[in-house]
Amino acid sequence: MSSIELGKQAEYPEQYSPDCLEPIARSLSRSGLGLNASALPFTGLDVWTGYELSWLDLSGKPQVAIGYFEFDAKTDAIVESKSFKYYLNSFNQTRFESWAAVQTLMQQDLANASGGDVNVRLEPLSAVSPLETPAGQCIDDCPLEAAVYTPDAALLKVEQGEVSEQLFSHLLKSNCPVTGQPDWATVWVSYRGNKITPESLLAYVVSYRQHQDFHENCVEKIFTDIMAQCAPVELSVYARYTRRGGLDINPFRTNCGAALPGWRIVRQ
């Protein structure tokens, strides 16, 4: 991991440069969770939003857009965030024939870098959705049962009796494994099964406070821990992280084919 560009000083490219993109194999994290790429217990997406996206049209006139980048959870690799930022900035002084040409090129480059399916959507600023509150119950006012700051699945508790509900917390904090910078997020859990006590889920969320890992890996650990400890019939986990360098990362994992929630929260 020491070879990646995150945390290093580098010059921003002045022209289109797909070589900026730096993949990190998903297997590096998944092996520690006992996950096999050929038999994943979930499907999902990593949804990145790019807020600082610009290029030139053929006349040299700047274009600006909001970019939505959806990486299938089955891709071989995630893309290191700083390299993604450098890649997007390489479009700033490059001329393109159309928005469609930019979108197609980005989709090809990101698919090549990640080794799998990627969907890219560019939208004008006027099309951006308003802020929303996640569906379900916020658990942040529950008392904290244990002040533990490293992930501990044993904190999760269930009560007998099947329910179908959605719980969320704004208190998720993890940390970049390269720079140590804090990563802040709202995490949303939708499930059907024995009732997860809100207090125990809150304690579990808080236990990530000193944990170092990438966003995507944190969500997969949350998913696998809840499955192992609580055994829900259906489970979806979604984290909306705050943006850094004009990009936010929003991993979603589900075992029931649930639709990706479309909301954007207040810290984004």
UniProtKB/Swiss-Prot annotation:
Main subcellular location: cytoplasm
A GO cellular component entry from the record: cytoplasm
Annotated NADPH binding sites: 81-82, 244-245
Catalytic activity: 7-aminomethyl-7-carbaguanine + 2 NADP(+) = 7-cyano-7-deazaguanine + 2 NADPH + 3 H(+)
Alphabetical UniProt keywords: Cytoplasm, NADP, Oxidoreductase, Queuosine biosynthesis
GO molecular function, one term: preQ1 synthase activity
UniProt EC number: 1.7.1.13
Compartments, as annotated in UniProt: Cytoplasm
SUPFAM superfamilies: Tetrahydrobiopterin biosynthesis enzymes-like
Its biological purpose: Catalyzes the NADPH-dependent reduction of 7-cyano-7-deazaguanine (preQ0) to 7-aminomethyl-7-deazaguanine (preQ1).
NCBIfam families in the cross-refs: QueF
Stated family: Belongs to the GTP cyclohydrolase I family. QueF type 2 subfamily.
Oligomer status and interactors: Homodimer.
Name of the featured protein: NADPH-dependent 7-cyano-7-deazaguanine reductase
Lineage, opening ranks: Bacteria, Pseudomonadati, Pseudomonadota, Gammaproteobacteria, Cellvibrionales
Gene (name only): queF
